[in-house]
């Protein structure tokens, strides 16, 4: 059900009524010791965003799409989120439980303007991983790949994601594909033609390196392949293709530094990045220290305020416990200057995703 502009303004205004009071309570506790960066104290109410934002990267319970969407709709007001996007986990053909956008699209269509779906993680991504394994990226494979991508677009996905180039074992298996693989180059062309983005999960690996300490091989590869140069070739292949590099702030190699992000953003105008903070797994090069944005990250977000979006990797329904990913990210978001919040919160999303999303955000007041 499409939300009318009048209803959207009312909803956003209503969601903001409690922000000042709740934020005041948060600031009251800000000077007290906390067990995690930016984490609200146990027992306090959730702290919503100071201004509306789009939660661009979330996942869901594929066995209960209706419950997932109900949970997300309930979260909109609690978070002061204008929209929530669901992405498919990047997967392989031999992994039980693989799925794609078709499991969620019928439910999501009922709530256009509130939730939206990216697709391809369970099929396009699996086709790329299979192609890497077989070495076959010939005309027949490319034809089948393009047909599937265009089928997803006809069904109503607003982008391709979550795709993977270097992904550790977890909910889905370990995955590696060169970001300049022929099927990724083809996907960039398809994305550019249809005006939709690609959302890519890729650990930063400037040169071949051993698997970082703390991770096991198997199931992960013992050595990680260099991928930054190949990633730049993907970005340069079709400058009209908007590429979102997922999870800035959740570094699994030690190389996704603000300096690397800055260099790539300067070099490639079609590159965008999601900000992710996880209170339970900081990883390396975390953007927060004692709840405060580190200066080097604040400078990056400010200097490239037109290139970042919010993507917490939150799961819906929310896991039990107070440490929600969206909350940690909102506490970071609330520290940004108001003009930067406006861009990162909604304006960049409207530009990246185009009119199909921008029309729903036009009435949002930042």
Predicted regions and their residues:
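Mid-to-C-terminal alpha-helical segments outside catalytic/metal-binding sites
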Residues: 5-14, 26-54, 67-94, 299-309, ...
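Core hydrophobic alpha-helical transmembrane segments of single-pass membrane proteins
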Residues: 14-22
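Alpha-helical scaffolding within the catalytic cores
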Residues: 38-41, 68-72, 97-106, 143-148, ...
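Active-site gating/metal-coordination segments in enzymes
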Residues: 40-46, 51, 98-206, 211, ...
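Hydrophobic faces of well-ordered beta-strands that scaffold small-molecule active sites
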Residues: 54-58, 83-86, 115-120, 160-162, ...
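Acidic-and-aromatic substrate-binding clefts and catalytic sites of carbohydrate-active enzymes
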Residues: 60-68, 90-100, 125-127, 136-141, ...
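N-terminal cationic-hydrophobic initiation segments that often serve targeting/anchoring roles
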Residues: 76, 108-112, 153, 235-236, ...
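Catalytic pocket-lining loop regions of alpha/beta-barrel enzymes
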Residues: 176-310, 360, 364
């Amino acid at each position: 059900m499409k939300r009318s502009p009048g209803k959207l303004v009312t909803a956003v205004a209503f969601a903001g009524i409690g922000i000042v009071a709740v934020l005041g309570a948060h600031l009251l506790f800000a000077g007290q010791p906390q067990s995690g960066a930016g984490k609200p104290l146990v027992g306090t109410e959730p702290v919503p965003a100071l201004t509306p934002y789009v939660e661009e990267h979330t996942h869901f319970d594929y066995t209960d799409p209706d419950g997932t969407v109900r949970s997300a709709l309930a979260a909109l007001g609690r978070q002061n989120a204008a929209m929530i996007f669901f992405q498919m986990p990047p997967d392989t053909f031999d992994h039980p439980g693989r799925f794609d956008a078709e499991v969620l699209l019928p439910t999501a269509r009922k709530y256009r303007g509130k939730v939206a779906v990216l697709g391809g993680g369970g099929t396009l991504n699996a086709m790329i991983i299979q192609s890497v394994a077989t070495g076959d990226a010939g005309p027949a494979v490319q034809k089948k790949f393009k047909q599937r991508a265009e089928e997803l677009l006809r069904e109503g996905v607003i982008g391709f994601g979550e795709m993977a180039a270097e992904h550790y074992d977890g909910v889905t298996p370990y995955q590696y594909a060169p970001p300049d693989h022929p099927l990724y180059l083809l996907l960039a062309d398809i994305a550019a033609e249809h005006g939709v983005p690609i959302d890519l999960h890729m650990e930063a690996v400037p040169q071949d390196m051993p698997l970082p300490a703390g991770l096991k091989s198997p199931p992960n590869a013992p050595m990680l392949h260099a991928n930054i140069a190949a990633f730049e070739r993907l970005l340069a292949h079709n400058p009209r293709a908007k590429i979102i590099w997922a999870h800035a702030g959740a570094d699994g190699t030690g190389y996704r530094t603000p300096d690397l992000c800055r260099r790539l953003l300067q070099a490639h105008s079609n590159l965008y990045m999601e900000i992710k903070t996880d209170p339970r797994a900081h990883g390396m090069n975390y953007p927060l220290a004692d709840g405060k944005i580190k200066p080097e990250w604040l400078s990056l977000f400010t200097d490239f305020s037109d290139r970042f979006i919010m993507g917490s990797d939150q799961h819906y329904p929310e896991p039990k416990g107070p440490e929600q990913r969206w909350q940690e990210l909102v506490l970071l978001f609330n520290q940004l200057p108001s003009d930067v919040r406006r861009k990162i919160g909604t304006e960049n999303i409207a530009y990246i995703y185009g009119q199909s999303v921008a029309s729903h955000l036009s009435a949002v007041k930042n």
